[in-house]
From Swiss-Prot:
It comes from the Bacteria. One of its GO terms (molecular function) is calcium ion binding. It is a multi-pass membrane protein. Keywords: Calcium, Cytolysis, Hemolysis, Host cell membrane, Host membrane, Lipoprotein, Membrane, Repeat, Secreted, Toxin, Transmembrane, Transmembrane helix, Virulence. The lktCABD operon has a complex mosaic structure that has been derived by extensive inter- and intraspecies horizontal DNA transfer and intragenic recombination events. Acylated by LktC. The toxin only becomes active when modified. This is Leukotoxin. Hemolysin-type calcium-binding repeats lie at residues 715-732, 733-750, 751-768, 769-786, 789-806. The chain crosses the membrane at residues 230-250, 297-317, 359-379, 381-401. GO terms for biological process: killing of cells of another organism. The gene is lktA. Pasteurella leukotoxins are exotoxins that attack host leukocytes and especially polymorphonuclear cells, by causing cell rupture. The leukotoxin binds to the host LFA-1 integrin and induces a signaling cascade leading to many biological effects, including tyrosine phosphorylation of the CD18 tail, elevation of the intracellular Ca(2+) and lysis of the host cell. This leukotoxin is a major contributor to the pathogenesis of lung injury in bovine pneumonic pasteurellosis. It also has weak hemolytic activity. Belongs to the RTX prokaryotic toxin (TC 1.C.11) family. It is found in: Secreted; Host cell membrane.
Length: 954
């Protein structure tokens, strides 16, 4: 039993795979049904091999067939065997009564002769030589076959089908197979040649005027002389009615009322009547054959039938309807915004879902019949006619249904196509799919308007310019593929909005965003003195797209994407003080990917920014950037994103504010633009559309170089950066990480940020703030200022001359502890953090221990200042250390210094000077430092467009 179920399952699967492999996208194959083949669609040839011998003296039946054929207008052709064999082999139509060749439909005289000699017929008529009523019977048989073919192949342009090997050719072959099966089964069911000819003729006459086999089941039931017990035409009628209904539904010229009737026939007669008839019919056949019909046998048959019904098929259909329902709900909002594409997609899902449901129901019934008959016929010799009937008919009907299903799918898809074309015709110059992106963008704008209106306050800018990239949309991609309009679709679209004083402005007159040519111009700032340019979502690289749809297989198409790339974005600013965050501008393009989707070869898009006037801030992204700060005080930030450690070398620069920045981005993930493929299915037609989008991709590391001109400050990364300053005034912030900063010449402002940094001011009057971490600070020559705050850690300071100052900006001097440790002065705050001034006492001690030693180095800090401007000089420190016990300054002595009138009298100028210096570097911080004044909106995390992307059903 297990083997039998396995065989049944295998046969069903093979039948399904065979049917599936034959699907294609032709939508015209079932049109113009109802014309008879006799009227000229393609001629019929009665084929007689040249070497086929028959005895005319004995009245061979073939002679009568020839005469009948000539009278009926059927061409009689004698051909060389090898020529016909070649044609038959090439078209796959061999060993049948009927076949297709390049010259027409061949009626094989030898095969017909063999058919007439089969046991039942032969017993009644003896042999071919004794065909009774010769000519009249021959004419009856040929006329019947001719009529059957006229209906089965109605409307098919066989000339074109034979030339192009199109879908119609496959359908024609299936129709011939159906006719062959009918002829075979009639021959197996009758006992005389008269009956055979009569049945063929009756069937042909019944079908003669039936358009597309419409109501064939009812026609067959009216045939006289058919034995339902032997042929089971109650089931055959239902099956053929199902096929006929499918043909009607696929016929684009059929009326709505006809299609409604056909749908009713599918749902009721096929699914209902056939399913009910299966079990009783099978059991009746077993009784007629003298086989068992007991409970266990009935259970066996029922279980076999149930095995043939796949719940997964119906689950898939349910998914289509659920998807359609979700799409309709989703579409309501976008329809109000001027886009009805989601409704079209829902219409397609419902239409094809209905077709799927109908065809699946029929195929389920077919599979159940095949399985049940196999079980019923087990061990029976007399059941072979029934098995022949089922195997010959159900497989052919299933094939026809599958081809009809594809045609019906294409019919639904064509309606979608036509609606899109009609919309574009009524809206000249507009693109339907671009209109879809517009609607998606407007919906996103509505959803985020409250957040956007608050950006002026949150970003502290009079004007906020928000640039939004609407990326690839799966629903739009599905619609483009289904409608065969993939060449018109875009990978996305960029939009720009402006906000001032909490109001939304039209940005088209304020900002030029040209994605095709790579231009972003925000120079028209109007009355706004400050503006923030915010890229809300990753902006794709500039350029134009062109697509071409090509066929890659019998049912496979791909719409190839060609990009005319522009190698850079050109950003222009004007008089306003502007902030640009470029970390969301895609600069890396994944040209080649490995099987895991990791980037193995890349291309880069440069950013060229001319900032104009104003005090500007630029947050650099992942690729090469050229920035000309122009006038004003301009800062370049590397503190956002994870784009590798900096190496800045300005030692050879000849102009102030000019820097070359080299970066190496280590192996990891970075934002890349890549090309992917979207797949949409229309039955067996597969549409692939290439599109570009951005996401974080694994890469093997890369180098990039930035060129900065007229830049006043540079803020580093979270990595271990190296800064080498110029001979001019430099301003560096190390950010996080263990940074090495060398100011070189000039009056530099150097800030270490987090991490154990090494900072050397070099020549010039430098401002040095180690930030958090245990830092090594060297002032070099010049009048240097050092800053330490509570929480900054343990710093070590080395000085080499000049009038230097150390500010404890948030501590009172009287709360500090001053202590001599070896040659060094150690100052400890209330958090027990220490600032060690290296070699403070070394020169004096050398003078005491080395004869005739002359001090040559000044390694002291001349003034140490508290948060309120109180100060103590290096001379006072030396005196109080010498006076105190254990090499420490006495607290009372220190308090007296703090409270000194003269210090208070002169402190104001000192305090004001230091406050300006300290506040000027307050923005020298990484993005996560509490002292950063250029924050990222926290609510940016809620502005992703991904929430708008509709999730397609599996």
């Amino acid at each position: 039993m297990g083997n039998k179920f396995t065989n049944i399952s295998t046969n069903l699967r093979n039948s399904w795979l065979t049917a599936k492999s034959g699907l294609n996208n032709a939508g015209q194959s079932l049109a113009k049904a109802g014309q008879s083949l006799k009227t000229g669609a393609k001629k019929i040839i009665l084929y007689i091999p040249k070497d086929y011998q028959y005895d005319t003296d004995k009245g061979n039946g073939l002679q009568d067939l020839v005469k009948a054929a000539e009278e009926l207008g059927i061409e009689v052709q004698k051909e060389e065997s090898n020529d016909i064999a070649k044609a038959q082999t090439s078209l796959g139509t061999i060993h049948n009564v009927l076949g297709l060749t390049e010259r027409g439909i061949v009626l094989s005289a030898p095969q017909l002769d063999k058919l007439l000699q089969k046991t039942k017929v032969g017993q009644a008529i003896g042999s071919t030589e004794n065909i009774t009523k010769g000519f009249s019977n021959a004419k009856t048989v040929l006329s019947g076959i001719q009529s059957i073919l006229g209906s089965v192949l109605a409307g098919m342009d066989l000339d074109e089908a034979l030339q192009n090997n199109s879908n119609e050719l496959t359908l024609a072959k299936a129709g011939l197979e159906l006719t062959n099966s009918l002829i075979e089964n009639i021959a197996n069911s009758v006992k005389t040649l008269d009956a055979f000819g009569d049945q063929i003729n009756q069937l042909g006459s019944k079908l003669q005027n039936v358009k597309g086999l419409s109501s064939l089941g009812e026609k067959l039931k009216g045939l006289s002389g058919f034995d339902k017990t032997s042929l089971g035409l109650d089931i055959v009628s239902g099956l053929l009615s199902g096929a006929t209904a499918a043909l009607v539904l696929a016929d684009k010229n059929a009326s709505t009322s006809r299609k409604v009737g056909a749908g009713f026939e599918l749902a009721n007669q096929v699914v209902g009547n056939i399913t009910k008839a299966v079990s009783s019919y099978i059991l009746a056949q077993r009784v007629a054959a003298g086989l068992s019909s007991t409970g266990p046998v009935a259970a066996l048959i029922a279980s076999t039938v149930s095995l043939a019904i796949s719940p997964l098929s119906f689950a898939g259909i349910a998914d289509k309807f659920n998807h359609a329902k979700s799409l309709e709900s989703y579409a309501e909002r976008f329809k109000k915004l001027g886009y009805d594409g989601d409704n079209l997609l829902a219409e397609y899902q419902r239409g094809t879902g209905t077709i799927d449901a109908s065809v699946t129901a029929i195929n389920t019934a077919l599979a159940a019949i095949a399985g049940g008959v196999s079980a019923a016929a087990a061990g029976s010799v007399v059941a072979s006619p029934i098995a022949l009937l089922v195997s010959g008919i159900t497989g052919v009907i299933s094939t026809i249904l599958q081809y009809s299903k594809q045609a019906m799918f294409e019919h639904v898809a064509n309606k979608i196509h036509n609606k899109i074309v009609e919309w574009e015709k009524n809206n000249p110059g507009k693109n339907y799919f671009e209109n879809g992106y517009d609607a998606r963008y407007l919906a996103n704008l509505q959803d985020n308007m409250k957040f956007l209106l608050n950006l002026n306050k949150e970003l502290q800018a009079e004007r906020v310019i928000a640039i939004t990239q609407q990326q690839w949309d799966n629903n739009i991609g599905d619609l483009a593929g289904i409608s065969r309009l993939g060449e018109k679709v875009l990978s996305g679209k960029a939009y720009v909005d402006a906000f001032e004083e909490g109001k939304h402005l039209k940005a088209d007159k304020l900002v030029q965003l040209d994605s095709a040519n790579g231009i972003i111009d925000v120079s028209n700032s109007g009355k706004a003195k400050t503006q923030h340019i915010l890229f809300r979502t990753p902006l794709l690289t500039p350029g134009t797209e062109k697509r071409e749809r090509v066929q890659t297989g019998k049912y496979e198409y791909i719409t190839k994407l060609n990009i005319n790339r522009v190698d850079s974005w050109k950003i222009t600013d004007g008089e306003a003080s502007s902030t640009f965050d470029l970390t969301n501008v895609v600069q890396r393009i994944g040209i080649e990917l490995d099987n895991a989707g990791n980037v193995t070869k890349t291309k880069e898009t440069k950013i060229i920014a001319k900032l104009g006037e104003g005090d500007d801030n630029v947050f650099v992204g992942s690729g090469t950037t050229e920035i000309d700060g122009g006038e004003g005080y301009d800062r370049v930030h590397y503190s956002r994103g994870n784009y590798g450690a900096l190496t800045i070398d300005a030692t050879k620069e000849t102009e102030q504010g000019s820097y070359t920045v080299n970066r190496f981005v280590e192996t990891g993930k970075a934002l890349h633009e890549v090309t992917s493929t979207h797949t949409a299915l229309v039955g067996s037609r597969e549409e692939k559309i290439e599109y570009r989008h951005s996401n974080n991709r694994q890469h093997a590391g890369y180098y990039t170089k930035d060129t900065l001109t007229s830049i006043e400050e540079i803020i580093g990364t979270s990595h271990n950066d190296i800064f080498k300053g110029s001979q001019f005034n430099d301003a560096f912030n190390g950010g996080d990480g263990v940074d090495t900063i060398d100011g070189n010449g000039g009056n530099d402002r150097l800030f270490g940020g987090k991490g154990d940094d090494i900072i050397d001011g070099g020549d010039g009057d430098d401002f040095i703030d180690g930030g958090k971490g245990n830092d090594l600070l060297h002032g070099g020559r010049g009048d240097d200022i050092f800053v330490h705050r509570q929480g900054d850690g343990n710093d070590s300071i080395t000085e080499a001359g000049g009038h230097d100052r150390l500010s404890f900006s948030d501590s009172n001097l009287k709360d500090l502890t001053f202590e001599k440790v070896n040659h060094h002065l150690v100052i400890t705050n209330t958090k027990q953090e220490k600032v060690t001034i290296q070699n403070w006492f070394r020169e004096e001690e050398f003078a005491k221990t080395v004869k005739n030693y002359v001090a040559t180095r000044d390694e002291k800090i001349e003034e140490i200042i508290g948060q309120n401007g109180e100060r103590i000089t290096s001379k006072q420190v030396d005196e109080l250390i010498a006076k105190g016990k254990d090499n420490k300054i006495d607290k009372n002595d220190l308090a007296n210094v703090v409270n000194s009138y003269e210090l208070l009298k002169n402190s104001r100028n000192v305090t004001n000077s230091l406050d300006k210096l300290i506040s000027s570097v307050s923005s020298f911080t990484s993005s996560n430092d509490s002292r950063n004044v250029l924050a990222t909106p926290t609510s940016m995390l809620d502005t992703s467009l991904s929430s708008l992307q509709f999730a397609r059903a599996a």
